[in-house]
């Protein structure tokens, strides 16, 4: 191997990397400062306020509260150490923060010693109010433009041991070290946030016994119980965010964060240290190459597809269904000669580590590319997914991003069956807030406002995943539910780095960044697919080169460095568990366990590639300190079999007019029926209602009353089936908006030949039709209704008339031409675009560095969103 190769391996080794950081951390931990005390101050509170001025904090005695919570009690001659909470601000800032300091007083109550203050809030955009204290509990408000926005409650007793019961011993030690550095208390401080849901002019706090009363003016109030962390009164006025510990990072990333948090060292020095270390490794690699004449293939760079598919049983694709269009076409390798299967996608069919999606082609595919001619041993691995079938979501961590309003994220995927049963993957987010304060909003909660011209991925309210460069303002369109920003686009308009950025996170700002390290990225392809990119020992230019070769329309940089970047697949099972794998789990990249806080669910997890060295595997299915993305399977047709006795769903050869499928048909035998019944399901997200009088080439389903042997139509039913807001629903006919698709009753009429219901979970229409010559008509209709109930439709009605349900406007449910006469079409369901991947903010121009950089360098500040002006006809509304 040679001495350079051995040196590089030592420098890369896990046992070496923590050493310099641990040494610096030990020195930093020994540094302590004690503020001078004015013994002549008239009151202890005045003494504390004056002492903080030595630390550059403006405070008054009125903004100081002493907690009866005693941190430690020494012999009475030395006094006890108590906690003081202080509302203060920097002289150059008009916003207050909440500071905490430890105070030692004499037996007579004279302040003898004060520790250096700790800023508990550091919120850039809201003003913290004066604290109120009761025992270990501290409460205060935050305000924006003078209006209260949230109530914050602190518990100085810290986090209960149960929150970290599943941590390793090392993780518990790390967690205690982090809390000690942040607060001076190894158990930390519990910080719950109760955000006000309405507009109020005041929020007056007062502890009354064990409860916290919050007066909101006009007789309105909320009451909180800090001890049980419950809302006793006014829950409808609050959005509650209860703090819980997230799992700490791996040892090396954790040590780096702890050192950069030491004021005497700081982030800039850490960036310099990292840049020097990476440059040294790069030098060692070049020197080694000169000696050995060949590239290094590290343990984290598998030589080909085996790191992706040797266990999963993936299928190398050569053809694809033109109706579906996924997996993507193979990618042309960048370096020649190409390695076997380089650029060829592996479809992850029947993968035991991905939650199954019935009836559709595999929505995930993987490949790899080499992009650096000087490092031909490195790989950039790509996982691509079909955004029409897979939805992207994002969640804030319990620590990152550090919010400008003081609100922390939950750090977990929502613990509800509706979400968990559809989770298929998770992966890392972007940079920490201190490295640019790039915007983030999750599920409508804004943690950091958007930066102008920032590279942005979004979840829209219709479920689509979008990507684009934010425009030059910070307004968030109502259509956007969630967004995450990071830097500027690596790739846009078929160009690498069109924004001419020079800093990509590997060096101090202002240095030219060509650092080779572990990097990750996300892209939207020209076909509308999304891809996650991961490479070890790569620079941003190589990442961008791979994105361009993958036909990315937009490409953005995500988090970087070993331990921070990672992608995991998940398979979720509720209740019954999994089918056996038939082999032992491979612990270096596979895992099976129970979902914490939701024991009814079990999960299997697998890293995207076997050698992916990210921290805390499995990471994203647990509670995490940092923000992350997760993927869920959309509810698309055809889904699982209707009934054990039902035939397979049919989707091919039907008038779908697009993908995912709009309709599916099957047949089933039901008890009491002489013949099989025909069943149709319609996805409400795939169709729009339209007047039946006008033909439409994208007609999926047309409805008409029959004439002929059924005679004239009977009276309409009392219940109507309608399509609105992306769901079918059954409503009283007199309340139906627009033309009902069907009307029906609780009992069949002489003309009834069909039953309709709506699946509770997703609003899908289920329509069951008996044969025209069915000899046991009543029994068949009853059996059809029971079948819809087993399929998830808790409500159903018997269609009042003999209705013709015509696929494409003329076909019976078996796909053949309907021979029975019918009247004019009354309503059509025509194809509509479904949620998927799409570009956003396409009109944002690429501007010069001199325009975007000053805007992105500004510290975030929130501004009250202007209320919409009333419409001209508002005064006429009742």
Where in the sequence are the language-model features?
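Gly/Ser/Thr/Pro-rich low-complexity, intrinsically disordered segments
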Residues: 13-878
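N-terminal Lys/Arg-rich, disordered targeting/topogenic segments
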Residues: 1-15
């Amino acid at each position: 191997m040679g001495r350079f190769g051995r040196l590089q391996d030592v420098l890369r080794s896990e046992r070496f990397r923590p050493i310099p950081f641990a040494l610096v951390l030990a020195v930093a931990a020994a540094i302590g400062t004690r503020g001078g005390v004015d013994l002549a101050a008239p009151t202890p509170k005045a003494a504390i306020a004056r002492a903080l001025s030595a630390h550059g904090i403006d405070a008054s005695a009125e903004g100081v509260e002493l907690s009866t919570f005693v941190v430690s009690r020494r012999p009475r001659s030395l006094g006890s150490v108590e906690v003081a909470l202080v509302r203060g601000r920097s002289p150059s800032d008009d916003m207050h923060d909440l500071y905490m300091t430890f105070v030692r007083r004499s037996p007579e109550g004279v302040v003898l010693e004060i520790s250096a203050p700790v800023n508990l809030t550091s919120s850039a955009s809201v003003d913290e109010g004066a604290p109120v204290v009761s025992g270990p509990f501290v409460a205060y408000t935050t305000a924006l433009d003078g209006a209260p926005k949230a109530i914050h409650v602190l518990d100085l007793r810290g986090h209960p041991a149960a929150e970290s019961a599943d941590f390793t011993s090392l993780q518990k030690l790390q967690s205690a070290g982090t809390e000690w550095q942040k607060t001076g208390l190894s158990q930390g401080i519990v910080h719950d946030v109760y955000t006000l849901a309405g507009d109020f002019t005041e929020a007056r706090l007062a502890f009354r016994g064990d409860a916290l009363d919050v007066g909101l003016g006009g007789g309105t109030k909320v009451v909180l119980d800090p001890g049980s962390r419950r809302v006793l009164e006014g829950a409808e006025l609050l959005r509650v965010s209860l703090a819980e510990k997230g799992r700490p990072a791996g040892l090396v990333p954790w040590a780096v964060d702890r050192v950069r948090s030491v004021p005497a060292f700081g982030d800039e020095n850490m960036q310099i240290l990292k840049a020097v270390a990476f440059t040294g490794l790069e030098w060692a690699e070049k020197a080694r190459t000169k000696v050995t004449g060949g590239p290094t293939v590290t343990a984290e760079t598998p030589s080909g597809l085996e790191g992706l598919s040797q266990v999963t049983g993936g299928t190398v694709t050569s053809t694809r269904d033109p109706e579906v269009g996924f997996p993507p076409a193979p990618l042309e390798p960048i370096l020649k000669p190409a390695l076997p299967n380089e650029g060829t996608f592996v479809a992850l069919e029947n993968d035991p580590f991905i939650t199954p999606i019935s009836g559709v082609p595999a929505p995930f595919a993987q490949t790899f590319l080499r992009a650096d001619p000087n490092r031909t041993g490195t790989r950039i691995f790509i996982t691509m997914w079909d955004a029409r079938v897979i939805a992207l979501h994002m969640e804030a961590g319990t620590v990152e991003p550090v919010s400008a309003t003081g609100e922390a994220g939950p750090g977990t995927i929502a613990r509800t069956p509706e979400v968990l049963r559809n989770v298929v993957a998770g992966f890392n987010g972007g940079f920490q807030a201190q490295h640019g304060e790039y915007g983030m909003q999750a599920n409508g909660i804004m943690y950091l406002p958007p930066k102008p011209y920032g590279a942005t991925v979004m979840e829209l309210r219709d479920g689509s995943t979008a990507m684009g460069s934010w425009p030059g303002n910070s307004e968030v369109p109502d259509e956007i539910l969630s967004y995450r920003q990071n830097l500027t686009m690596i790739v846009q308009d078929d160009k690498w780095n069109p924004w001419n950025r020079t800093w990509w996170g590997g060096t101090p700002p202002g240095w030219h960044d060509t650092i080779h390290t572990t990097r990750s990225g996300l892209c939207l392809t020209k076909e509308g697919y999304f891809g996650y990119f991961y490479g070890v020992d790569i620079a941003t230019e190589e990442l961008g080169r791979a994105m361009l070769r993958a036909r990315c329309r937009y490409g953005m940089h995500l988090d970087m460095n070993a331990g921070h970047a990672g992608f995991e697949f998940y398979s979720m099972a509720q209740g019954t568990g999994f089918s056996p794998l038939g082999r032992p789990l491979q612990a270096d990249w596979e895992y099976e366990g129970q979902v914490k806080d939701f024991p009814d669910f079990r999960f299997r997890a697998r890293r995207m590639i076997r050698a992916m060295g990210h921290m805390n595997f499995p990471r994203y299915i647990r509670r995490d300190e940092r923000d992350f993305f997760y993927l869920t399977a959309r509810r698309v047709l055809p889904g699982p079999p209707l009934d054990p006795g039902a035939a397979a769903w049919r989707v091919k050869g039907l008038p779908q007019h697009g993908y995912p499928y709009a309709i599916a048909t099957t047949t089933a035998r039901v008890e009491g029926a002489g013949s099989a019944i025909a069943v149709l399901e319609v996805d409400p997200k795939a169709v729009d209602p339209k007047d039946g009088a006008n033909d439409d080439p994208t007609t999926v389903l047309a409805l008409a009353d029959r004439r002929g042997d059924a005679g004239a139509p009977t009276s309409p039913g009392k219940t109507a089936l309608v399509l609105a807001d992306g769901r079918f629903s059954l409503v009283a006919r007199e309340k139906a908006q627009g033309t009902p698709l069907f009307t029906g009753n609780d009992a069949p009429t002489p003309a009834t030949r069909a039953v309709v219901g709506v699946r509770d979970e997703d609003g899908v229409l289920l329509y069951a039709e008996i044969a025209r010559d069915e000899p046991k008509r009543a029994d068949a209709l009853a059996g059809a209704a029971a079948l819809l109930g087993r399929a998830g439709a808790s409500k159903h009605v018997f269609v009042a008339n003999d209705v013709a349900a015509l696929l494409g406007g003329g076909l019976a449910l078996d796909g053949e031409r309907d021979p029975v006469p019918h009247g004019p079409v009354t309503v059509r369901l025509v194809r509509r675009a479904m949620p998927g991947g799409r570009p956003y903010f396409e009109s944002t121009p690429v501007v010069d560095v001199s325009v975007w950089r000053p805007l992105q360098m500004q510290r975030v500040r929130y501004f009250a969103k202007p209320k919409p002006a009333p419409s001209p006809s508002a005064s006429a509304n009742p």
